[in-house]
Amino acid sequence: MGLGNPGRRYALTRHNAGHMVLDELFRRHGGRWRRARRAEAAEVSVEGREAVLLKPATFMNESGEALSGYRAEDLIVVHDDLDLPAGTVRVKVGGGAGGHNGLRSVISRVGNGFVRVRVGIGRPPEGADVTGYVLGRMDRAAREAIPRAADAVEAVLEEGPEAAMNRFNARA
């Protein structure tokens, strides 16, 4: 599941990092987008492993609404993360929402035992509005992380979460 907001207005914003990563995975693996319950979905095959790319058609704070029938242990949730420097990609299993309303919605629907691929967008400048920042256009460093985040999703699918964490969470 890639977190983001629907519509062109939000397509290139920091908060839509999850949608952008799913678009990259779709580009790599093909498939066909279809309308699903409160989401767009595409079935893809990654190294022989079947996966569903799911982009909620709801706004961020209602993302969990698209998860009817899904279990936490079957999910990889890709999202923007203010607490990581722009361009950083990290993999994590479990945890809290950390102030992220999309994650809060997902956790309220399925619990917190899912894998996360976190795309760092950095913090806004001192005194700047956080909402305006996350809904602002993604900067170059964060954009360049999108293919690496797609690599991280593929690694989780191919090698498992622990191997993906070892690979993507290592300090350079």
Curated annotation (Swiss-Prot):
Its EC number is 3.1.1.29. This is Peptidyl-tRNA hydrolase. TRNA binds at Y10, F59, N61, N101. It comes from the Bacteria. Monomer. GO terms for biological process: protein quality control for misfolded or incompletely synthesized proteins; rescue of stalled ribosome. Its main location: cytoplasm. It catalyses: an N-acyl-L-alpha-aminoacyl-tRNA + H2O = an N-acyl-L-amino acid + a tRNA + H(+). Keywords: Cytoplasm, Hydrolase, RNA-binding, tRNA-binding. It is found in: Cytoplasm. The record marks D80 as: Stabilizes the basic form of H active site to accept a proton. SUPFAM superfamilies: Peptidyl-tRNA hydrolase-like. GO terms for molecular function: peptidyl-tRNA hydrolase activity; tRNA binding. Pfam families: Pept_tRNA_hydro. GO terms for cellular component: cytoplasm. The record marks N5 as: Discriminates between blocked and unblocked aminoacyl-tRNA. Coiled coil: none annotated. Belongs to the PTH family. It comes from Rubrobacter xylanophilus (strain DSM 9941 / JCM 11954 / NBRC 16129 / PRD-1). Hydrolyzes ribosome-free peptidyl-tRNAs (with 1 or more amino acids incorporated), which drop off the ribosome during protein synthesis, or as a result of ribosome stalling. The active site is at H15.
